[in-house]
Regions:
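Bacterial N-terminal signal peptides
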Residues: 1-11
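Non-catalytic cap/lid and distal C-terminal segments of serine-dependent acyl enzymes
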Residues: 16-297
């Protein structure tokens, strides 16, 4: 089981103390950690796996699989939401959850800035003393997920690899948009929350034009989400609004461009979450994303 120090509700259990002087840790039931030492990237990554209720009791059943970026934060959150909203299969279809963890030895910011961004940033600063800032390895990371993470998950868990979902927020949403425009059939569904489309002078919007110039279809189901405060305050008095990046406008522009091509196998929806900003929107966005991608059968 995966151990966390969290103040969250069931399905967490309290493990037996390892020593009399140490308080017990909080663990997430039915979870595992797999470590991949990537030869291609030269780094180690933890892959967090959460199994649905009844997984062991139904050996003939295969499950859809949700991959979520920023696992350190997103995995326990999605796990808890799936437990509560899923309501034993009545609210959501049961699924296997795979959390994509950060590289060992990196801070979360260093790892995600490198792995989730599609190009370098000349103005970047490093949050790791003695290490230069590093951005722009989203394509290498995408290949790592496809060639190393996918085989591990398929070989060890009863998943339906024809029902893969990718969910990401902020830089994770930027990475999801990169995958969508690079290899759209890598996943069947995409939950893209508050993507950092502003990155590198909106490089993803340029990639969208390049994709459209050489393709006549984009076969994927896509949910785009953003908070209503992720735009600029027209009177500049409300601190809940963004100060410089109009992420709501960028998302609308991305949506309109995708729709304009009338791709025959693209299904796209957009949800603006009222009353939420960039840091508060994800719990609601992923809840709606689960309901959209995995409705109860």
């Amino acid at each position: 089981m995966l151990a966390f120090v969290l103040g969250l509700a069931s399905p967490f259990v309290v493990a037996a103390p390892k020593a009399a002087a140490s308080p017990p840790a909080v663990e997430l039931a039915d979870t595992e950690v797999r470590t991949i030492a990537s030869t291609a990237l030269g780094r180690r990554y933890d892959i967090l796996v959460g199994l649905p209720e009844g997984y062991a009791a139904q050996p003939g059943r295969r499950y859809p699989v949700l991959f979520v970026t920023d696992a350190n934060y997103a995995f326990p959150l999605v796990r808890s939401i799936a437990h509560m909203v899923g309501d034993h299969g009545r609210g959501l279809e049961d699924f296997v959850l795979v959390g994509l963890g950060y590289a060992a030895g990196d801070t979360p910011q260093y790892s995600r800035r490198r792995d989730y961004t599609p190009r370098g940033d000349a103005d970047a600063r490093s949050d790791m003393p003695g290490r230069a800032p590093l951005h722009g390895e989203a394509e290498a990371y995408r290949r790592f997920v496809a060639t190393e993470v996918f085989p591990l998950v398929a070989a060890n868990y009863r998943v339906d690899m024809k029902r893969k979902i990718l969910a990401g927020h902020s830089y994770g949403g930027l990475f999801a948009a990169h995958v969508l425009l690079t290899e759209p059939t890598m996943f069947e569904r995409y939950v893209i929350s508050s993507p950092s489309l502003w990155y590198d002078d909106r490089v993803v919007l340029r990639r969208e034009r390049e994709y459209a110039a050489t393709h006549d279809d984009l076969p994927a189901d896509v949910l785009l989400e953003v908070g209503s405060y992720e735009t600029l305050d027209p009177v500049a008095h409300d601190p809940r609004y963004n100060r410089s990046k109009d992420m709501l406008r960028d998302l609308r522009l991305f949506e309109s461009r995708l729709r304009a091509h009338r791709y025959p196998h693209l299904r796209i929806e957009t949800k603006v979450v009222a009353g939420e900003g960039h840091l508060s929107v994800f719990p609601i966005a992923i809840t709606r994303g689960l309901q959209w991608a995995l409705p109860a059968r």
